[in-house]
Amino acid sequence: MDNRLLEILVCPLCKGTLQHDRAHNELICHVDKLAYPIRDGIPVMLADEARQTVEGTPVDPA
């Protein structure tokens, strides 16, 4: 995932920042507790495609 793209992408619901979880290939919104999948290098920024995250689950940024 391109770091320049990560800098401009925001959560489509709350417009908050996203954190890249490389281990699970997802973009995480901690405000809405949603994880948006990245498929074939393309972030799928649709709320219907996002999964709910578990409160307190650490994100692996490595």
Curated annotation (Swiss-Prot):
Any Pfam family the entry gives: Trm112p
Gene Ontology CC terms: cytosol
Source taxon at top rank: Bacteria
Family: Belongs to the UPF0434 family.
Database matches in HAMAP family: UPF0434
Protein name from the UniProt record: UPF0434 protein RSc2531
Organism: Ralstonia nicotianae (strain ATCC BAA-1114 / GMI1000)
